[in-house]
């Protein structure tokens, strides 16, 4: 937000328009999760936010939840344009599970792999996924894999042992060049949110999972941006967040119906190609730039 002040000065000095690209909405997100509690600082950031929206010629947002939030703050609808974040669909793409290095290296061959890979923070309740795994521990073919930062994994390992989740494997982040094969090792990709996550939150992993061609199970609020994105794509199932039984039921459904998992993955891949490919996003930004300078 502070960068909006020099941007406005440069805009006035050179007579050029400002395009504000919103990847998050502050201070709303920080206040909602308790990272920002000082009332004076909240007022400062709120004032900067209003200034940024007022001085911008156009505001590009990454999802419809952002649009709804801005409209409640009386930002003119004609200022707002939705341009989603892109994914490299030539890099992240469906690959065969057979002879997959990630499966071989981690003894996952013959397993139904439920994969969560990414940030493990305040808004991602991975304990729910571990609890769901406990419900499935008697089905040896189902393996839950969580990939993340070492520090967060240490905390989860204690919880895993405490719950007796022997079917949960915790692994560190993989090198970027191995990401496509890691995603391809999964039968199901997970998106996890707490029930009270701010509604406009749009995890960037959704585009990546869709592009990988694997079915998604999203444990997210039904009225949130993430749920709408997955439902529109046709690439996954949405279940009640922080509900281990509901999550276990969804995992079991795809385990017992591999054809459904395949169909969801194919639909997700098609949606990613049509809506999240780099070329699509680039075209939208080119049109936006042409519009503001014409």
Set out the residue ranges of the language-model regions.
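A short, well-ordered alpha-helix in the C-terminal region of glycosyltransferases
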Residues: 246-249, 253, 260-274, 284-287
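Membrane-proximal helix-turn-helix segments that form the acceptor-binding/catalytic region
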Residues: 2-5, 9-17, 39-61
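Nucleotide-activated donor-binding/catalytic signature segment of Leloir-type glycosyltransferases, i.e.
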Residues: 139-141, 145-148, 153-180
């Amino acid at each position: 937000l502070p960068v909006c002040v020099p941007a406005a000065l440069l805009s006035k000095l050179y007579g050029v328009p400002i395009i504000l690209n919103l990847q998050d909405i502050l201070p709303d997100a920080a206040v909602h999760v308790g990272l920002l509690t000082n009332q004076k600082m909240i007022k400062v950031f709120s004032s900067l936010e209003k200034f940024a929206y007022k001085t911008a010629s156009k505001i590009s947002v990454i999802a419809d939840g952002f649009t709804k939030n801005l409209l409640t703050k009386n930002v003119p609808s004609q200022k707002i344009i939705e341009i989603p974040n892109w994914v490299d669909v030539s890099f992240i793409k469906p690959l065969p599970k057979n002879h997959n290095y990630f499966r071989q290296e981690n003894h996952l061959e013959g397993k139904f792999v439920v994969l969560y890979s990414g940030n493990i923070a305040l808004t991602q309740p991975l304990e729910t996924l571990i609890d769901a795994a406990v419900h499935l521990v008697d089905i040896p073919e189902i393996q839950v894999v969580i990939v993340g930062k070492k520090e967060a994994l240490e905390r989860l390992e204690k919880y895993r042992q405490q719950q007796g989740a022997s079917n949960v494997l915790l692994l560190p982040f993989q090198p970027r060049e191995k990401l496509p094969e890691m995603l391809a090792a999964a039968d199901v990709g997970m998106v996890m949110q707490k029930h009270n996550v701010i509604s406009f939150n749009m995890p960037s992993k959704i585009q990546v999972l869709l592009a990988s061609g694997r079915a998604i199970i999203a444990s997210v609020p039904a009225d949130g941006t993430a749920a709408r994105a997955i439902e529109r794509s046709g690439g996954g199932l949405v279940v009640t967040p922080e509900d281990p039984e509901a999550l276990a039921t969804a995992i079991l459904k795809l385990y017992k119906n591999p054809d459904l998992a395949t169909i969801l993955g194919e639909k997700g891949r098609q949606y990613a190609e049509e809506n999240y490919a780099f070329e699509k996003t680039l075209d939208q930004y080119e049109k936006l730039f042409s519009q503001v300078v014409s």
